[in-house]
Each structure stands twice: as structure tokens, then as C-alpha cells.
């Protein structure tokens, strides 16, 4: 741990009066006095949430990124802090283009002139982890090939990140041990989540894989374009993508002048979101306006694939159940769905959770449906969840953040956008497919290889369970065996029914 970096953090906390958090804490009274020895001018004129944001900005890009991640954890933070941290911007001066050139050559093992016809040393975009340069691939005959964006990892960033993460882990441990609310805030868990997020961003091949997956999911789509990845020109430090031409989605007047149908575009955004979540179970989780452009043909263009989310079939099912129940005001079903999914502890009383959900949702539903925010519904529920010791899953936090971005974007394009009217047919159709014959056939097809493997092993499993010397293992093994036997019998019965139906049809 760097002493100079630690001292800078202490001085910054004191400058913005954040040592006030220590006030009244008997075990930390000596620290509060030590802060007073800092030879730094103290400014406490701004509200405390704003001072937290300013302190993070002063501590540099890694702390800014941490604040951005923290702003999504509305299940942990009071609203005024989450709102203030959401204002943080990842603004970092670019590093020298010649250094970027050296990184490319070292990482790809070839001279830039051998890889590209032109490589613009002036970056078109810069952030804390990487910056982007424009280039053209060199064809075998030496001619100019495809226009590309070359994303280059900032050199020397890893030691800086590891140093700051080490300090964050130490601070998180202190908060958890010394503050009454420390365990509920789960600071070490939040830092661990941030650690994973940062290290994913440091590996350009991780982003390349995300882009490829999303591109495959939307192949031939009339709503979304995802740039092609050039793997022969990519590595852990360099990512080369197809250059995309378009208008930034936030430039509404330019879109109008280009003849883009803004109402259609806003609906596309909602449909793209729900398609990613419920069809693919894999979604772009950083869809703020800076990462979205609009092509000449009116399709969205997605950029920056460092942050994605994924959902299991169970997550998708309960999300759909919750959305449909919310907008039908079936709060009891919302409560039971939360308990069934494991999002709240099993011993939670459904009636108490139902009452809490009703308290959150009824004021929201007094508004016209076109003004209701899906994201705000989830946000309010996250805030309510603190009363019920809810374990908010990271993928659901990403989902809520993405949904807020999509809603904000959609209503910026079309203030009259009725999100529920756009989403309900999609959700209803998806649910019908899951519980109807199509869903059954899809499940049978998916599970068939597992049945073929599992059924022959049942006698051996029974013998192993009966031969166990420990009673608890015997009982557990027997229960598990009976459950599996019932499941297999039920599925075999369904197969028999389907085969009989097909046979009867062929005989008619």
C-alpha cells in the first residue's frame, strides 16, 4: 500500500469534510482528531452527497469509476447519494499517440505500417482505461482496406488500479467492522464487484467476445447494428472494431434533419432491450447516449461492450412475472414471486412484503401509464428491499441501470412513449411461449441428452445412497433420488403422450 497515496486520500477526505462521518463514533475519535492536523483548507459549504462526489473526482479516474458503479447500488445507498454519484464523468486527458503506436506494435507483434495503411495518432476518444484511434486496415496488395476503430489500453494502468483497489479493500474492511450499518452496506462485496468489473475492462479480448456475442444475437436485425470484431488485429491490450458511421443519439435536431423517425426509434430502443433480456438473456449494460449512434437507415448502432449482463432462465421468468404483476397491480403475486425466486429470504412473510410493495407502487400507478417508469419501479423496490434483507443480484442491478438509460433515451426521442404499451405484448407473448406447448417442446429437446445420461445411473445412485453410513446423507440422498425419479417419470410420461399424439396423427 502506497503511503503517499494513503496520505492523499486522507487529505482529500478532510478537504471535503468527509471526516464528519467519524463524528460521534467513540472508537474512531482519535482519527477524527488526526484529520484536524491536515494542512489543508476544509470546505464544507456544499451538501454532503455533493462533497462525496467532488472527493471521488479529486482522487482520480479509478475512484470516479468506483463512484459510477456505486451509483447503481440504490439498494444500498440513500437516493440523494446515488443521484449525486450518477453525475460522475470518466474524463481523462489522452496519452501520447506515439505511445499508443508502441502499445499496438508490442501487443500485436508487427509494425503499425504492416497492419494499417493509415493510423491516426490523434485519438478520437479518451477515457481512464483506454483511448480510441481511427485507422484503415492494410490489404494484402498494400491498398487501403476496411475503416476501423483501434481501442488501445492505457499503458501503466494496471499498477495504479491494483494500488487503489488495495486501498479500497482496506477502507471497506474498516467500514464493515467499525460502523453500525457497515455489514448491511456490504462494502467488501461492492469493492469485489468493482474489482471484477475493472479487470474485465482491462482485457480487450473480453470486450471483443461480448461484441461478437451481441453481433451474433442481432444478425440480420432491422433495429440494431453491432460492429464486427477483427480478431487478427486484437489482443488483450488492443481491440480493433469496424468503424461505424452515424449520428449520436443525443443530437435530436440532427436526427430530425436526417429524416429519422424518432417515434419508431424510441420504440426500437424498448424492443431491443426486452429482446436482449428475455430472448437472449444477454444484454449490453452500458447503453448511455455516449455509446449509442443512429445509422443512416434509422437503425441503432451499439458501441463499447465492456459491461454486459446475463440472466438465467429463472431470472427471466421471474422478471416477466414481476413486470406483468406490477402493471396488473397484483402485489401479492409480486411478493410471492420475490420469495419463490430467492430474491428475498424464504422466511419473509408474503403479506408484509405485499404491503411494502403496495406502498411503493400505488403512488406511481396514480400517474398515466405513459408516464410510469419501469426503471423507477425497480429502483423504488430496491430501496424498499433494505427492510427485508434482500440479496440484490448484480445482474439485476445492471438491468435496472440499463432500463433507466433506455427509458430516458426513449422519452427524450418521443416524450409520449408509452413503455408499458410497447412492452406488454412482448412480455405476454414470451410468457405464453414459456408455459405453452412450444415451451414444453423446447424444454424436452434441451433436456433430452441429460435424461439419456441420468436414467442409466439411477440404480447406482440408489446403491450409493443405501450404502452410506451417515443417516443424514442417506436421507438427503433418498429425497434427492425420489425428486429426480418423479421428475424423470413425469418427463417420460410427457414424451409418451407426445409420441402417442404423433403416432395417432400419422394413422389418421
Swiss-Prot record:
ATP binds at residues 124-132, 151. It holds the Pfam family ABC1. Its main location: membrane. The chain crosses the membrane at residues 488-508. GO terms for molecular function: ATP binding; protein kinase activity. The gene is ubiB. Residues 118-494 form the Protein kinase domain. Its EC number is 2.7.-.-. It comes from the Bacteria. Pathway: Cofactor biosynthesis; ubiquinone biosynthesis [regulation]. GO terms for biological process: regulation of ubiquinone biosynthetic process; ubiquinone biosynthetic process. One of its GO terms (cellular component) is plasma membrane. Keywords: ATP-binding, Cell inner membrane, Cell membrane, Kinase, Membrane, Nucleotide-binding, Transferase, Transmembrane, Transmembrane helix, Ubiquinone biosynthesis. It is a single-pass membrane protein. The active site is at 286 (proton acceptor). Belongs to the ABC1 family. UbiB subfamily. This is Probable protein kinase UbiB.
Amino acid at each position: 500500500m502506497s503511503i503517499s497515496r494513503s496520505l492523499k486520500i486522507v487529505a482529500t477526505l478532510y478537504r471535503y469534510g468527509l471526516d464528519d462521518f467519524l463524528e460521534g463514533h467513540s472508537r474512531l475519535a482519535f482519527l477524527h482528531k488526526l484529520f484536524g492536523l491536515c494542512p489543508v483548507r476544509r470546505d464544507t459549504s456544499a451538501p454532503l452527497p455533493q462533497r462525496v462526489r467532488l472527493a471521488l473526482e479529486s482522487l482520480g479516474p479509478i475512484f470516479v469509476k468506483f463512484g459510477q458503479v456505486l451509483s447503481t447500488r440504490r439498494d444500498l445507498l440513500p437516493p440523494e447519494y446515488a443521484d449525486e454519484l450518477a453525475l460522475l464523468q470518466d474524463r481523462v486527458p489522452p496519452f501520447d499517440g506515439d505511445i499508443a503506436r508502441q502499445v499496438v506494435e508490442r501487443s500485436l507483434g508487427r509494425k503499425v505500417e504492416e497492419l494499417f495503411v493509415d493510423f491516426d495518432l490523434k485519438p478520437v476518444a479518451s477515457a481512464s482505461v483506454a483511448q480510441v484511434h481511427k485507422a484503415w486496415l492494410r490489404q494484402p496488395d498494400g491498398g487501403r482496406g476496411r475503416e476501423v476503430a483501434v481501442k488501445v489500453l492505457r499503458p501503466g494502468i494496471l499498477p495504479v488500479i491494483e494500488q487503489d483497489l488495495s486501498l479500497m479493500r482496506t477502507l471497506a474492511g474498516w467500514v464493515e467492522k467499525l460502523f453500525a450499518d457497515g455489514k448491511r452496506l456490504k462494502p467488501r462485496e461492492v469493492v469485489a464487484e468493482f474489482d471484477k468489473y475493472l479487470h474485465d475492462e482491462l482485457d480487450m479480448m473480453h470486450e471483443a467476445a461480448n461484441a461478437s456475442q451481441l453481433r451474433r444475437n442481432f444478425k440480420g436485425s432491422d433495429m440494431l447494428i453491432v460492429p464486427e470484431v477483427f480478431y487478427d488485429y486484437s489482443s488483450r491490450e488492443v481491440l480493433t472494431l469496424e468503424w461505424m458511421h452515424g449520428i449520436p443519439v443525443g443530437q435530436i435536431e440532427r436526427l430530425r434533419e436526417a429524416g429519422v423517425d424518432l417515434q419508431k426509434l424510441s420504440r426500437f430502443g424498448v424492443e431491443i432491450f426486452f429482446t436482449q433480456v428475455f430472448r437472449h438473456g444477454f444484454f449490453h449494460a452500458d447503453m448511455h447516449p455516449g455509446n449509442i449512434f443512429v445509422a443512416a437507415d434509422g437503425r441503432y448502432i451499439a458501441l463499447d461492450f465492456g459491461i454486459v449482463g446475463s440472466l438465467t432462465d429463472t431470472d427471466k421468468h421471474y422478471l416477466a412475472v414481476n413486470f406483468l404483476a406490477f402493471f396488473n397491480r397484483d402485489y401479492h403475486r409480486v411478493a410471492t414471486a420475490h420469495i419463490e425466486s430467492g430474491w428475498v429470504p424464504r422466511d419473509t412473510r408474503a403479506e408484509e412484503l405485499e404491503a411494502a410493495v403496495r406502498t411503493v407502487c400505488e403512488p406511481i400507478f396514480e400517474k398515466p401509464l405513459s408516464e410510469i417508469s419501469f426503471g423507477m419501479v425497480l429502483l423504488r423496490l430496491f430501496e424498499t428491499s433494505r427492510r427485508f434483507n434482500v440479496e440484490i443480484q448484480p445482474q439485476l442491478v445492471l438491468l435496472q441501470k440499463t432500463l433507466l438509460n433506455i427509458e430516458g433515451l426513449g422519452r427524450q426521442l418521443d416524450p409520449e412513449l408509452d413503455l408499458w404499451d410497447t412492452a406488454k405484448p412482448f412480455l405476454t407473448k414470451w410468457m405464453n411461449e414459456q408455459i405453452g406447448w412450444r415451451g414444453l417442446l423446447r424444454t424436452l429437446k434441451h433436456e433430452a441428452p441429460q435424461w439419456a445420461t441420468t436414467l442409466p445411473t439411477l440404480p447406482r445412485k440408489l446403491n450409493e445412497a443405501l450404502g452410506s453410513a451417515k443417516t443424514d446423507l442417506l436421507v438427503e440422498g433418498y429425497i434427492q433420488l425420489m425428486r429426480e425419479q418423479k421428475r424423470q417419470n413425469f418427463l417420460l410420461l410427457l414424451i409418451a403422450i407426445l409420441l402417442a399424439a404423433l403416432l395417432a396423427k400419422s394413422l389418421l
